[in-house]
Amino acid sequence: MNLSSLPHRLLAAAVALCAIAAPASAERIKDLAQVGGVRGNALVGYGLVVGLDGSGDRTSQAPFTVQSLKNLLGELGVNVPANVNPQLKNVAAVAIHAELPPFAKPGQPIDITVSSIANAVSLRGGSLLMAPLKGADGQVYAMAQGNLVVGGFGAQGKDGSRVSVNIPSVGRIPNGATVERALPDVFAGSGEITLNLHQNDFTTVSRMVAAIDNSFGAGTARAVDGVTVSVRSPTDPSARIGLLARLENVELSPGDAPAKVVVNARTGTVVIGQLVRVMPAAIAHGSLTVTISENTNVSQPGAFSGGRTAVTPQSTIKATSEGSRMFKFEGGTTLDQIVRAVNEVGAAPGDLVAILEALKQAGALTAELEVI
């Protein structure tokens, strides 16, 4: 078995498995679109985590932690003199964020994520004190409090040496917040239901309108644009929910995904759609490797010579150029042929990225090239 060709075979397999194939079966509307107005809302807050085992904020470098603690103690009836700045290591200032799900009602719990703001080493073992969570409108929608679950581990010595595993400065509290205010109900009271596709596609919109009309009668649905389908519905909430329960299970064959190539230039990852084609083209691809090595020489003068020891750097630069590789693609070349041609000459994933970018610039790649 030729082990040298194994990475290239794995590349071909990875690209082939990641290929965006055209859908071969019908999909439900609930998998293709979301109901307009049914969405979550971001919540954010600020609070204090206490009970840390010496891994909290260094308050000399984070004065807002002390200020927050003083404010909290003042609300609890404990007065701290203004000229006193306690040096604490078991308290950390944190940011809290969560998502308020659609139709959430007061009293329901939601999960929250807690992240250190200052220089706390770890939040492990800490407890979040009661903190309000606000929406974009500045209103308080939930109250957060509870014991943190931290997956990472961190420790720091007095000399500044530090060791950490994963990210110990971020934790979660399952069911750590309680909803206090419900969102305004935008679902009831309208005579239409709006369906928004996850990805805009005129073919899918047209087929969705036809599928809904076939199931509920002609004129039930109408296309608004390449993303939105409007469906006539009753205003009674129970009837609307019954209609939606049937509507989201209607099946249709969505339109083919557009020909697209996605390239991650940092990692060399390439995802090529199945419908990608290449016009007739020929490419010569070579590479230049530059190696720079640094050595340090010490010049030691003789005894009693009056000279001084000097350190002189010595640099060695070496450039090597590999032979050019010629690729020739006929009209209508497919994904498999492109990958096979590149792998046969032992090219790396980075070479494939460069070739695809060159084909796009030459107008020979009949697909959208997206670099992430």
Swiss-Prot record:
Residues 1-26 form the signal peptide. GO terms for biological process: bacterial-type flagellum-dependent cell motility. GO terms for cellular component: bacterial-type flagellum basal body, distal rod, P ring; outer membrane-bounded periplasmic space. It comes from the Bacteria. The keyword Zinc does not apply. The basal body constitutes a major portion of the flagellar organelle and consists of four rings (L,P,S, and M) mounted on a central rod. It is found in: Periplasm; Bacterial flagellum basal body. Assembles around the rod to form the L-ring and probably protects the motor/basal body from shearing forces during rotation. One of its GO terms (molecular function) is structural molecule activity. Its main location: periplasm. Keywords: Bacterial flagellum, Periplasm, Signal. Disulfide bonds: none annotated. The keyword Signal applies. Belongs to the FlgI family. It comes from Xanthomonas campestris pv. campestris (strain ATCC 33913 / DSM 3586 / NCPPB 528 / LMG 568 / P 25). This is Flagellar P-ring protein.
